[in-house]
């Protein structure tokens, strides 16, 4: 047997065994696939899973083929094959862990956000992978010297190839027929790009042409719009109302709506009784970047890239600067972090921007305390003859980092899981921040500024701990009410307190300030997607966004649109098995996502 032929045989068997190894690691993906109910979904999931693991297992071998053909030397080929296979294996381990935690796969943004400790673990995974792959590769190399007696390898390769082809054909059929139990599985496999050919199936008479039109609509929604920004659509016509009020915006990162109560947030609950509380308020995203964008701009966060590329601030911040507001901007987490990047969007072009909170003591709680002290100091040094805009962005809740000596909000039973412990730390951090924000409000009253200041307390998004039993935890993982429903409490001098039950969103905050504070007479549609919070309107649909996808949120359902497909979930965030696309809402959303491009 020639060296080249033996190396090709070794590479093929090495790929098959690597596919089996990856399948063992990848079983974690199947664990979270909630739609495995109909038999067709079971069959497809198994075929797609085996086919994709085969593709990933064979990828190092395919990269090795040119080397084997040109330089058939075992001492060169085997080490390269082991390193490539180890890289794929360590990637799979990391991706499965990320997916289990966040329900999305590893991407460029994920690598940018990895902590140094995670990089250390990734290096450890790689070294362990090298050891495993080296032993596996040497064992296969020894076995490859024995001439094959049966054609097991050919039959095995044929079977895996059939799995690959059959799964892609099944997906093409399922997508054309909107069969969600099959199409929903796409997002569970890493680097999986199944066949999509609805148009050809329609030409062959295998599917309804109407289904193809629906598919085109979703495909259009999944593509980011292109073009130059046209923002605002018309020059602003504003005449501020004198004397001009101060504005204080307090954002508690990841504070969800249902924690605003006397047990966990007594100070803010007391504040809400003398203010306007919006009970059905939603963020524009399930992560900080999208939530903060919708809060400052009043636009869907699908525009984030376009504004960030130009460092284009919102008209709200332009007006604060135009009318000589003093800006007291204090964020616990760095404004330049990849998570939010406020320095490229809402706080862009601000001279001497305070970019981060520096604390000699590690931890979000320590930074939050320093942030508050620096706010007090700034407030005492400001020019009292000019109005101010204050922005306080607290971080302890989203980081699950209350002070070490702070009494826990709920007890943690012995042997509790990590997420049970996180839930306790989250609630404790909320209680800690409630007290901290309460002192900020007391300080305003002591300085006799509360009657001349619009005070807004809200959050950028919520937080989930698998209360729905769907396996979603944290934030940025789902468009459920737990991650989208946020508190909003506003005390506006001269307006009576009350509770608003109609649906509102972050998109409505900027239009409210422009109309009521700056006296802008433009229709809100000139610069935002929302309406004034003090109007009688409510949204019938809302565009929610995350880092990787977006959703059309309606009162009774959520349509999640991803680059590789879509899924529809009900109010309890359960997957809808045979959905009907909300065509009217999707077309309106598509128009809104393109309205501010030329």
Question: What residues fall within each predicted segment?
Answer:
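Active-site-proximal alpha/beta segments of enzymes that process anionic O-linked groups
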Residues: 163-413
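A solvent-exposed, charged loop/short amphipathic helix patch at secondary-structure junctions
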Residues: 406-427
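Phosphate/adenylate-binding glycine loop and adjacent helical scaffold
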Residues: 527-598
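Short beta-strand segments
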Residues: 251, 282, 329-331, 388-396, ...
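Transmembrane and membrane-interface helices of multi-pass
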Residues: 1-193
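Histidine-centered active-site microenvironments of extracellular/periplasmic hydrolases
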Residues: 445, 449-494, 539
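Active-site rim elements
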Residues: 43, 47-49, 303-307, 361-363, ...
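Substrate-binding rim/cap in mid-to-C-terminal beta-strand-loop elements of soluble/periplasmic
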Residues: 286-297, 472-526
């Amino acid at each position: 047997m020639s060296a080249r032929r033996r190396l090709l045989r070794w590479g093929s068997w090495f790929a098959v065994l690597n596919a089996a190894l990856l399948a063992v690691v990848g079983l974690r993906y199947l664990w979270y696939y909630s739609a495995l109910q109909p038999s067709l979904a079971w069959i497809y999931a198994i075929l797609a899973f085996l086919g994709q693991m085969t593709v990933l297992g064979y990828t190092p071998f395919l990269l090795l083929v040119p080397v084997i053909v040109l330089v058939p030397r075992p001492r060169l080929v085997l080490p390269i094959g082991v390193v490539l296979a180890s890289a794929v294996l360590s990637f799979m381990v990391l991706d499965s862990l990320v997916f289990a935690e966040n329900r999305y796969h590893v991407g460029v943004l994920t690598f940018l956000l990895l902590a140094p400790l995670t990089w250390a673990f990734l290096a450890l995974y790689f070294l362990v992978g090298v050891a495993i792959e080296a032993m596996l590769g040497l064992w296969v190399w020894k076995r490859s010297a024995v001439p094959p007696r049966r054609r097991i390898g050919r039959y095995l390769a044929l079977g895996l190839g059939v799995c690959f082809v059959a799964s892609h054909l099944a997906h093409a059929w399922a997508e054309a027929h909107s069969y969600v139990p099959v199409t929903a599985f796409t997002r569970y496999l890493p680097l999986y790009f199944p066949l999509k050919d609805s148009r050809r199936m329609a030409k062959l008479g295998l599917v309804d042409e109407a289904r193809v039109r629906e598919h085109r609509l979703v495909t259009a929604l999944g593509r980011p719009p292109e073009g130059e920004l046209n923002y605002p659509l018309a020059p602003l016509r504003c005449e501020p109302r004198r004397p001009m009020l101060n504005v204080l915006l307090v954002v508690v990162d990841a504070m969800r709506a249902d924690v605003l109560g006397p047990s966990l947030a007594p100070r803010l609950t007391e504040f809400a009784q003398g203010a306007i509380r919006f009970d059905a308020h939603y963020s524009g995203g399930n992560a900080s970047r999208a939530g903060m964008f919708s809060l400052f701009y009043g636009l869907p966060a699908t525009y984030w890239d376009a504004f960030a590329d130009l460092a284009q601030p919102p008209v709200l911040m332009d007006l604060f600067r135009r009318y000589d507001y003093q800006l007291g901007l204090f964020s616990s987490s760095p404004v330049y972090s990849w998570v939010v990047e406020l320095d490229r969007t809402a706080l862009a072009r601000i001279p001497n921007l305070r970019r981060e909170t520096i604390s000699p003591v590690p931890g979000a709680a320590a930074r939050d305390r320093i942030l508050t002290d620096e706010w007090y100091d700034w407030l005492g040094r400001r020019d009292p003859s000019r109005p101010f805009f204050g922005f306080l962005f607290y971080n302890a809740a989203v980081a699950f980092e209350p002070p070490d000596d702070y009494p826990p909000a709920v007890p943690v039973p012995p042997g509790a899981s990590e997420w049970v412990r996180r839930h306790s730390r989250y609630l404790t951090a909320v209680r800690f921040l409630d007290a901290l924000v309460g002192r900020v409000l007391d300080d305003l009253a002591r300085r006799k500024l509360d009657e001349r200041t619009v005070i807004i307390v809200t959050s950028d998004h919520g937080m989930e701990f698998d209360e729905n039993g769907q396996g979603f935890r944290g934030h940025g993982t789902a468009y459920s009410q737990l991650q989208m429903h946020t508190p909003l409490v506003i005390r506006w001098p001269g307006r009576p307190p009350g509770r608003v039950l109609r649906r509102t969103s972050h998109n409505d905050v900027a239009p409210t300030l422009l109309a009521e504070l700056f006296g802008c007479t433009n229709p809100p549609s000139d610069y935002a997607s929302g309406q004034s919070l003090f109007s009688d309107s409510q949204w019938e649909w809302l565009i929610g966004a995350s880092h990787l996808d977006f959703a059309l949120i309606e009162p009774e359902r959520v349509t999640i649109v991803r680059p590789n497909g879509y899924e529809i979930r009900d109010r309890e965030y359960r997957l809808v098995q045979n959905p009907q696309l909300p065509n009217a809402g999707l077309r309106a959303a598509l128009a809104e996502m393109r309205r501010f491009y030329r």
